[in-house]
């Protein structure tokens, strides 16, 4: 869900324009400042603000949470409440949601639009179904995807596209195998009444050799092309970043194609595979039936997904006594704990390694890194999270900023990232970084063996590769 929201916000400024504009604007990754979250577009989105795609996905998630599953009246209530204040609503969805009652609304919209309701709005919001579907059987998850699509889109292709993507998301979360999940979805749907739609209407755009740059196809406002392009973007790349950029660079309905691709790529690469400069600034507002306007930021979207999985919100550890930030390296790198870091000047760069709630919203130069002080699979892409943290420190330093690195207590995660940065900056191995941290930071703790192992092995090899041999 976070992957979909991030991709949606990145694609929004380029919506309904020609292809290639993202890469023309950003020929290289922008690791400093607020990254590539520029905002703008036809609806003047704020930098990092997600669009109707994610707003509707969160409305759908809230409806699933309230009802414990699909309940058409509850979902209709959430959709119509969202629509009452939304500044961008797709044509098909807008027509359908004019009706106070869900029954017959999609068919009426279909007739009003001359039978053209095979649009991508049924799929742009599908990420919560893939997540919630982990708790359901495969058949139940597919049925849920079809039911939510049918509320607003009468054309069966809109339901099939939504169900196909939801099934891929669900399968990828469960197995970690994206390509295997795609093939499994083809095999599963072939045995259902929806199979002929994939085999006929979607066949060309879902083919393994589909190339959106060299084939004629319908606009990507249609469900067929949007799903095909999003699948292509993930299938032909090897990172979340590259998948989303590939989707946006196709032009047209960039936010929606990116949102669909981001949902699948997020399932594949996980929260730690999403560039932190993107996840830090994503935000938006959804009007809800019971709580009015609700502001969502990255952790709020993660919590929504957690609740759909039955996990509840991420636990918040009680705050500790603030520890005054300390300069630990003359390059301008500081260390602190959560509430100590919250007291640094607003022109500091802040690299946060824990849940911060609203403490740093007034700090324009910040990075929120998803990292858990745990062994096992709680950090499935720890190398990437460390690499992103180190790059953020260096980017802020290059801008002439002082940088504070912190976690909740300022102990294990803070030291892990600072040691990784020191190894990279000084071109040394972990034992020297360990000694530096021992001599420099009184709160240093070494209780997470996973952190030690990464610095000793994979990160050490990385430093040797980029420095020509660590000292």
Language model regions located:
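Structured, active/binding-site neighborhoods that engage oxygen-rich ligands
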Residues: 1-318
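Short glycine-/acidic-enriched loop or helix-start segments at secondary-structure transitions
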Residues: 15, 360-362, 415-417
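Short, cationic motifs built from Arg/Lys/His that form the positively charged side of catalytic pockets
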Residues: 124-125, 413-414, 441
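Short Gly/Pro-enriched loop/turn and capping motifs at secondary-structure junctions
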Residues: 254, 266, 410-413, 423
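Cysteine-based protein phosphatase catalytic domain of the PTP/DSP
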Residues: 319-402, 420-454
């Amino acid at each position: 869900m976070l992957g979909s929201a991030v991709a949606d916000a990145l694609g929004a400024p380029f919506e309904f324009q020609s292809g290639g504009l993202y890469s023309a604007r950003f020929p290289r990754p922008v690791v400093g400042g607020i990254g590539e979250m520029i905002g703008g577009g036809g609806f003047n989105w704020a930098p990092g603000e997600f669009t109707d795609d994610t707003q509707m996905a969160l409305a759908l998630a809230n409806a699933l949470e309230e009802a414990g599953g699909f309940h058409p009246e509850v979902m209709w209530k959430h959709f119509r409440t969202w629509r009452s204040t939304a500044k961008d609503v797709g044509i098909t969805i807008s027509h359908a949601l004019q009706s106070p009652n869900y029954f017959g609304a999609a068919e009426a919209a279909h007739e009003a639009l001359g039978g053209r309701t095979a649009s991508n709005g049924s799929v742009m919001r599908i990420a919560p179904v893939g997540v919630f579907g982990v708790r359901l059987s495969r058949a139940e998850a597919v049925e849920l995807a079809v039911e939510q699509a049918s509320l607003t889109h009468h054309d069966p292709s809109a339901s099939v596209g939504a169900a196909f993507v939801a099934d891929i998301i669900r399968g990828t979360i469960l197995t970690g195998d994206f390509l295997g999940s795609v093939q499994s979805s083809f095999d599963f749907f072939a045995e259902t009444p929806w199979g002929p739609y994939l085999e006929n209407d979607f066949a060309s755009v879902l083919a393994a050799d589909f190339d959106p740059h060299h084939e004629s196809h319908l606009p990507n406002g249609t469900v067929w092309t949007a799903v095909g392009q999003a699948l292509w973007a993930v299938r032909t790349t090897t990172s979340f970043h590259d998948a989303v950029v590939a989707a946006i660079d196709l032009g047209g309905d960039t936010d929606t194609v990116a949102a669909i691709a981001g949902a699948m790529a997020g399932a594949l690469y996980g929260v730690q595979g999403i560039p932190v400069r993107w996840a830090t600034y994503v935000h938006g507002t959804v009007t809800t039936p019971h709580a009015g306007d609700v502001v969502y930021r990255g952790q709020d979207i993660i919590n929504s997904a957690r609740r759909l999985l039955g996990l509840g919100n991420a636990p918040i550890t009680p705050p500790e006594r603030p520890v005054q930030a300390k300069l630990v390296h003359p390059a301008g790198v500081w260390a602190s704990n959560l509430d100590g870091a919250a007291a640094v000047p607003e022109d500091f760069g802040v690299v946060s390694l824990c849940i911060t709630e609203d403490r740093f919203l007034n700090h324009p130069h910040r990075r929120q890194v998803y990292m858990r002080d745990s062994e096992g699979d709680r950090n499935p892409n720890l190398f990437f999270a460390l690499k992103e943290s180190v790059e953020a420190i260096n980017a802020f330093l290059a801008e002439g900023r002082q940088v504070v690195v912190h976690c909740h207590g300022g102990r294990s995660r803070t030291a892990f990232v600072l040691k990784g940065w020191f190894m990279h900056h000084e071109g040394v191995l972990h034992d020297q970084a360990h000694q530096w941290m021992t001599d420099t930071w009184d709160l240093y703790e070494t209780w997470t063996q996973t952190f030690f192992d990464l610095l000793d092995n994979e990160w050490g090899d990385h430093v040797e590769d980029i420095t020509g041999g660590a000292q």
